[in-house]
Amino acid sequence: MSNLKEIKRKIKSVHNTQKTTNAMKLVSTAKLKKAEEAAKRSKIYAQKIDEILSEISFQINKIVHNEDDVRLSLFHKKEQIKTVDLIFITADKGLCGGFNIKTLKAVSEMLKEYEAKNINIRLRAIGKTGIEYFNFQKIELLEKYFHLSSSPDYEKACEVIHAAVDDFLNGNTDEVILVHNGYKNMITQELKINHLIPVEPKSIEQTHNSLLELEPEGTELLEDLMKTYFEYNMYYALIDSLAAEHSARMQAMDNATNNAKARVKQLNLAYNKARQESITTELIEIISGVESMK
């Protein structure tokens, strides 16, 4: 009898877990739809900025006439890399399966790769998971940003990227790389590594007679465009990462719900078997008692 009570208690516990994970799955699904739409809209805008900047980059020496202009360095990779700033995004919350693993693995591998080349790498961490992971590894973090990956904010994104750009222009770092696990579709996330600074022109078709006309003056446009390019790439990465996080959490909760259902089924079978054995034992005892009285 005590065994039956224990199995019944387990069934109730697993069933409650199943209801919780199913509710979390529904919440993540609803959040994913909103995040997916935001990511799609942002991606279109970010791609258009990339295209314009890519075309301008081929004419940069015509736009910026002064060879000592510090803005030129944003387009030219240095011959000797001594320091690299790595901005990476992880989740602030858990229960999202292996969502953070890709990013943390990529960052860890890059750390080893650059250290082997005697290149100093500075980490700017966005998200509680990544911060706690590298704190546990006793690896120093240059900057820590909590609650930004779970609630992307444009002004905060600007603050993050402006600090990195300023360090590049001031000569404190030679390259800025942005790493995050991005959204591909509802069941797939993909690791994205963006070599943000210096700017790498995207592969677009170039013509001798460019259709791009620069208004206002090229230098003014470049100033505004560069600012928008860096800010929006940072902001888009946050939105893209959040959509991927909701996707991963939805899958994780769906798997947990299905596992709970399977476990309840197993426990019900065990309960019925134990109950049958209990009844059989009682019947045998009754029959034995009757026989002994004859």
Curated annotation (Swiss-Prot):
One of its GO terms (cellular component) is plasma membrane. Keywords: ATP synthesis, Cell inner membrane, Cell membrane, CF(1), Hydrogen ion transport, Ion transport, Membrane, Transport. Its main location: membrane. GO terms for biological process: proton motive force-driven plasma membrane ATP synthesis. Pfam families: ATP-synt (PF00231). It is found in: Cell inner membrane. It is a peripheral membrane protein. GO terms for molecular function: ATP binding; proton-transporting ATP synthase activity, rotational mechanism. PANTHER family: ATP SYNTHASE GAMMA CHAIN, ATP SYNTHASE SUBUNIT GAMMA, MITOCHONDRIAL. F-type ATPases have 2 components, CF(1) - the catalytic core - and CF(0) - the membrane proton channel. CF(1) has five subunits: alpha(3), beta(3), gamma(1), delta(1), epsilon(1). CF(0) has three main subunits: a, b and c. HAMAP family: ATP_synth_gamma_bact. Produces ATP from ADP in the presence of a proton gradient across the membrane. The gamma chain is believed to be important in regulating ATPase activity and the flow of protons through the CF(0) complex. Belongs to the ATPase gamma chain family. This is ATP synthase gamma chain. The gene is atpG.
